[in-house]
Amino acid sequence: MSVITVERIKLFSTRSPWWCMVIAAFLTVGFAALTTGFLNATDEPQATIFITQPGAQLSQMVMMVMAALAVTTEYRFGTIRTSFQAVPQRAALLLGKTAVVAFLAGIVGLIASFGAWGIGSLFAGNADLAINTGAEWRLLAGQGLIFALSAVIAVAVGILIRQSAGAIAILILWPLLVENLVTLIPKVGDDLAKWAPFANGSSFLNQGQDFGLAGAGAGGSDFALGPWWALLYFAGWAAALMLIALFTASKRDA
């Protein structure tokens, strides 16, 4: 069997990936139903496609946790040693694992985003939630790319940390807290924050969106890069972290 086939079987041999996928999809779709349903109940016409995606970041966090656990669980129970014995080329094994997890995360991201848009359209009443612009397609279809790249980052962090609690803490605090705290640095904080990796991932999705009731600044109004350059920058972070993780894994004991 190929490395990817083995990694797929290993991933789905436990319940946690299934639970993570269900929770990720439920969060995005559930929040879409709540927000658009509330706007419809108040006869508010300002529901937009952006309003259907409030749960996307939480779902992204859930899939990052799943990706990290795919690695750290093997280190925890020592099964990674057996895997390395079966596939002496550690980079090939870890890249296979990364490919499986990233592909799965990307699919979940697409299902969650378009599912949220579909449910939001049902609950939004008279609001026009038709996908009319390239920016709106980018917001929905782009979730798959962002989820996949986030999973790559999560696997890399899992390889580097090797401990579940530590890896999960980093992956949750990094986008939700650390990148926001950067803005508090005197004089240069705002400029540095524009180059934060997850901020650029959000920038790729949010540029050109109609934020509706969320306000013009909901997705950030001052971007350092255009949307596709922001995606490339985010992908560069994912690739760099993965290269560091692969180098580290090749040099230390399992």
Q: Each PLM stretch: what is its role?
A:
Residues 1-24:
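Aromatic- and glycine-rich beta-strand/loop motifs that create alpha-glucan
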